C-alpha cells in the first residue's frame, strides 16, 4: 500500500464464481438500486461504465461493469511517452522467427530497485494488439512495491502466474492476494498497483489480445471437472481516498505512456457487473486422466481458453500439469513425442516436469513452435520404458503451458540473453535406432 493511504473495503474478501454478475459496495448505500446511472448517484459519486466488449456483443460474450467512484476517470492530464525497457508487443519482427526448440534458464533477480511494471521483460508473442488477436508472453522480476504508481493495459487482459513471492494486486475493483500456485486475471483497462508483501516476486504474464479467457467446454466429461466455476474468486469493493500525486502508466499499442494524476484513481467505492479481476488456486483443479491405458491429449489439463474464429482452435489455451496419479497399464506414461500445429510456450512454477529430467528449472521457460519435434528427453524416456507400472503419484510439481494457434515469435532479448540454453537440442541426442526383426 502506498504510504499514508487507507484502503476501505467491503465486508468479506472475495465473491465466488466465474462470469457472474457481481455487486459490491465498500460503503453501505453507495450502490444505486434499480438503475445504473441515477440523476445523482449516492454521496455524489460518479457513475461510469467500463466496457470490455462492444455494446452489441451477444449477451454470453458481453462484458461490462458499472463503477461508482470519487472522481470520473476522465479527470486527468495528457499522457506522455515513457521508456518501455524490454517490454514489447506485436508484430514480433525484431528478429526472424526460429523453427528451433528453445529453452531458457531463470533470469537473475534485479540488481536495482525494480517494481512490477519496470520488471516486465517480453520473451515472445504473436498477433498484435491492434488486430485484437494473439498473445504477448512476458516474465516479471521485481524487488519493490509500486508506490504512488498505478498501471493498466489497454492492449489486452493479463493472466499473471506467480512463480516466486506473493503479489498483492490492488485494483480499481478490489484487492487480489495471489501466491505461487495461484493465478490472477486482470481485465483490459482495469487499473492496479502491484505490491510485494515478501519484498521480491517473479513470475510469468500472458497478455491476451484476443477473446476473453473463459472456461473450456467439458463435452463428454459432463457438468463438473477441470476448473470449477465456484473456485474462481473476485474481490469485494475496496478504494482509497488519496489526494497525492500518482503516476498512472498505461500500455497502448505496445508502448508505455505515463500521466501524473493529482490523486489515486483506485477510488471505486462500489461496482456491479461481470468485467472483473479474479484469481484461482490451481490446487483446486480437478485433474482428469486415464484409468486404463495411454496418455490422453494434454487438452484435458486446460484451465482457461481464449477461442479464435476457428472452433476448437485457440487463440490461447492456458494448460497446467499439476500433481496427479499415473495409473495407465502397459503405457508410456510421460507425455509422448509430438509435432504440433499449435505452438507451445512452457513455464515451471515449482518442482520437476515429468518429461524433462534436467535443465528445465522453475522460473525458466521453453518454446516449441509449430511442427518442431519435442517430447521427453533421453533420460526421462529410458526411465519410463523400464519403470514398474504400479500406481504412482507425481508430487510437488506445477508446470504450465500457453498454447496458441499462431507461431510464437521470440524477441531479440529472448534470442540474445545468456539465459538461452545453447545446448537444448542435446537433450534429445543419443536415442538408439529401433531394431527391426
Swiss-Prot record:
Keywords, sorted A to Z: Dioxygenase, Iron, Metal-binding, Oxidoreductase, Phenylalanine catabolism, Tyrosine catabolism
Binding positions for Fe cation per the UniProt entry: 338, 344, 374
Cytoplasm is among the record's keywords: no
Enzyme Commission number(s): 1.13.11.5
Enzyme category, top tier: oxidoreductase
Pathway where this protein functions: Amino-acid degradation; L-phenylalanine degradation; acetoacetate and fumarate from L-phenylalanine: step 4/6
InterPro entries: HgmA_C, HgmA_N, Homogentis_dOase, Homogentis_dOase_bac, RmlC-like_jellyroll, RmlC_Cupin_sf
Catalytic reaction equation(s): homogentisate + O2 = 4-maleylacetoacetate + H(+)
UniProt-annotated binding residues for homogentisate: 353, 374
A molecular-function term among this protein's GO annotations: homogentisate 1,2-dioxygenase activity
Catalytic center residues: 295 (proton acceptor)
Required cofactor(s): Fe cation
Annotated Gene Ontology cellular component terms: cytoplasm
Pfam families hit by this protein: HgmA_C, HgmA_N
Keyword Oxidoreductase included in the entry's annotation: yes
GO biological process: L-phenylalanine catabolic process; tyrosine catabolic process
Subunit details: Hexamer; dimer of trimers.
Annotated function: Involved in the catabolism of homogentisate (2,5-dihydroxyphenylacetate or 2,5-OH-PhAc), a central intermediate in the degradation of phenylalanine and tyrosine. Catalyzes the oxidative ring cleavage of the aromatic ring of homogentisate to yield maleylacetoacetate.
Protein family (similarity comment): Belongs to the homogentisate dioxygenase family.
Protein name per its UniProtKB record: Homogentisate 1,2-dioxygenase
Amino acid at each position: 500500500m502506498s504510504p499514508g493511504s487507507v484502503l476501505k473495503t467491503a465486508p468479506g474478501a472475495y465473491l465466488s464464481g466465474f462470469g457472474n454478475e457481481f455487486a459490491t459496495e465498500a460503503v453501505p448505500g453507495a450502490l444505486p438500486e434499480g438503475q445504473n446511472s441515477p440523476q445523482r448517484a449516492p454521496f455524489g459519486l460518479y457513475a461510469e461504465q467500463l466496457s470490455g466488449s462492444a455494446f452489441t456483443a451477444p449477451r454470453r460474450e458481453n462484458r461490462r461493469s458499472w463503477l461508482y467512484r470519487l472522481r470520473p476517470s476522465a479527470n486527468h492530464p495528457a499522457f506522455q511517452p515513457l521508456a518501455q525497457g524490454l517490454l514489447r508487443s506485436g508484430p514480433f519482427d525484431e528478429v526472424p522467427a526460429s523453427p528451433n526448440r528453445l529453452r531458457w534458464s531463470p533470469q537473475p533477480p534485479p540488481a536495482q530497485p525494480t517494481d512490477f511494471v519496470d520488471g516486465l521483460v517480453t520473451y515472445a508473442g504473436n498477433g498484435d494488439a491492434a488486430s485484437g488477436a494473439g498473445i504477448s508472453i512476458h516474465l516479471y522480476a521485481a524487488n519493490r512495491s509500486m508506490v504512488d504508481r498505478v498501471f493498466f493495459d489497454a492492449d489486452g487482459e493479463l493472466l499473471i502466474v506467480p512463480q516466486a513471492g506473493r503479489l498483492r494486486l490492488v485494483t480499481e475493483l478490489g484487492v487480489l492476494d495471489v501466491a505461487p500456485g495461484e493465478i490472477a486475471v486482470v481485465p483490459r483497462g482495469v487499473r492496479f498497483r502491484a505490491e510485494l508483501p515478501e519484498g521480491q516476486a517473479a513470475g510469468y504474464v500472458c497478455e491476451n489480445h484476443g477473446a476473453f479467457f473463459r472456461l473450456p467446454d467439458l463435452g463428454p466429461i459432463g457438468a463438473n471437472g477441470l476448473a470449477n466455476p465456484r473456485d474462481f474468486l473476485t474481490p469485494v469493493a475496496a478504494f482509497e481516498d488519496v489526494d497525492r500525486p500518482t503516476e498512472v502508466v498505461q500500455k497502448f499499442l505496445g508502448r508505455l505512456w505515463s500521466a501524473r494524476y493529482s490523486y489515486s484513481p483506485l477510488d471505486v467505492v462500489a461496482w456491479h457487473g461481470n468485467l472483473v479481476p479474479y484469481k484461482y488456486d490451481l490446487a483446486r483443479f480437478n485433474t482428469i486422466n486415464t484409468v486404463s491405458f495411454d496418455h490422453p491429449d494434454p487438452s484435458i489439463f486446460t484451465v482457461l481458453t481464449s477461442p479464435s474464429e476457428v472452433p476448437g482452435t485457440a487463440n490461447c489455451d492456458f494448460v497446467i500439469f499439476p500433481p496427479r496419479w499415473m495409473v495407465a497399464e502397459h503405457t508410456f506414461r510421460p507425455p509422448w513425442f509430438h509435432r504440433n500445429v499449435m505452438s507451445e510456450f512452457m513455464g515451471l512454477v515449482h518442482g520437476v516436469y515429468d518429461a524433462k529430467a534436467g535443465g528445465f528449472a522453475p522460473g525458466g521457460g521453453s518454446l516449441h513452435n509449430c511442427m518442431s519435434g519435442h517430447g521427453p528427453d533421453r533420460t526421462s524416456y529410458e526411465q519410463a520404458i523400464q519403470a514398474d507400472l504400479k500406481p504412482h503419484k507425481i508430487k510437488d510439481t506445477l508446470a504450465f503451458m500457453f498454447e496458441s494457434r499462431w507461431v510464437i515469435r521470440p524477441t531479440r532479448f529472448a534470442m540474445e540473453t545468456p539465459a538461452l540454453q545453447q545446448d537444448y537440442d542435446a537433450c534429445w541426442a543419443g536415442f538408439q535406432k529401433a531394431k527391426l526383426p
